[in-house]
Regions:
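Contiguous interface-forming segments/domains that mediate binding rather than catalysis
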Residues: 1-103, 107-133
Length: 133
């Protein structure tokens, strides 16, 4: 059976969740992923809910009893994969002549194995005198 737009789009998002889950050694309640793609600039971030609290990726070892590899190398590897996945989504949107989101907000609930996704299609930062640098 041939893949369709939705399959390829979701496959890239699933990879984003997978790499973030791997980064935290499958030990999170929720994973939050943010990506922005405007005017050829792609940015992103990811953070976690662990033990009922929100933690940035570089602060995970502040969690009592936890010891993660939060090295710059590991964070960079995860970020590279996230941004490559956004580029894959760009290619999928182009292939299927679909609009490309300018902003992704993904929340993955580990226990429920469910993904809540919110997309914006208008520029959020470009040309905004306050939000852009």
């Amino acid at each position: 059976m041939a893949k369709i737009f939705e399959d390829e789009f979701m496959e890239a998002q699933a990879d984003m969740v997978s790499i973030c889950l791997e980064y935290v050694e499958d030990d999170a309640e929720k994973i939050y992923i943010y990506a922005s793609c405007e005017n050829r600039a792609i940015t992103g971030d990811y953070f976690y809910k662990i033990n009922g609290q929100i933690w940035q990726r570089h602060h995970l070892n502040r969690i009592p009893g936890k010891n993660y590899d939060v090295s710059g190398e590991r964070q960079g590897m995860c970020m590279r994969i996230l941004l490559q996945d956004v580029q894959k989504i760009q290619a999928v949107c182009k292939t299927y002549n679909q609009p490309m989101p300018t902003q992704f907000k993904l929340v993955y609930d580990v226990a429920k194995n469910s993904l809540d996704a919110h997309y914006e299609y208008e520029n959020q930062y470009s040309y905004d005198p306050v939000k852009s640098s």
